Amino acid sequence: MKKLTSVLLALALALSLAACGGAASSSTASSAASGEAVSEAASSEEAKELSTTDALRIAGLKGPTTMGLVNLLSMEEDGAASMDYDLQLYGAADEIVPLLMKGELDMAAIPANLAATLYQKTEGGIQAVAVNTLGVLYVVEKGGDTVQSMADLAGRTILSTGKGTTPEYVLRYLLAQNGIDPDKDVTIEYYSEATEVTAQMANTEDAIAVLPQPYVTAAGLQDDTLRVALDLTEEWNKVADTQLITGVTVVRKEYAEEHPDVVAAFLTDYAKSVEAANTD
């Protein structure tokens, strides 16, 4: 993977953000659009007269890209949300894409590279409204301290999730930038979900894996022989001139054009949900 790829990805995301008019701020844990950017567009009074009374159908992946969404449901139960939400969680991005394309979802929290691909394939029909996740990927080593740099991964087997999505592209890019051929110099075993990776690590001596938070912390609590060997955000910053964006929230353009007030109200709720997640 060339450095140009990362630049094009960032450009595609920037274009989609600009096209939808929803610039956003974010944090490494999980972040969404700043409430300051949208609060004036969706006050509580406006939320009572939204252009649709249907629940906003939104999907997310199990993991960091959806952490900022989880408090929407409790907000809805408490009467603090601007609308009703139908939030569905999936184990893999390829489960979400067809639902989004067929109009069975209104929004989704997905890997950044997938968002860029969908933006291009749909000619802007799928657009980003918020960056929800920055750098949350780590190399974790079990029972040793042999991995001190990307170069130390040469010749090793690496367990990972996210084949065809951000984790794969980030890992391959970083390996290549450090002189390691990801197809010849390492063996990468992909699993559908992070929980499958942690289960495999438990049964493998000297295992090495790429995991996102919060799974890194959860795995460490279950096995005290695990250690964080590398922060892939730090490794990215050493070789790339773009920020590492791993997840974004997207909306169907048709839905955004028909219900701009709903999108604005969602972003306000989203910001509150993220704030609660970061506080918890």
What residue spans do the PLM features occupy?
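Flexible, active-site-adjacent loop/turn segments at secondary-structure boundaries
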Residues: K2, D145, K253-E254
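Sec-dependent N-terminal signal peptides of Gram-positive bacterial secreted proteins and lipoproteins
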Residues: K3-A23
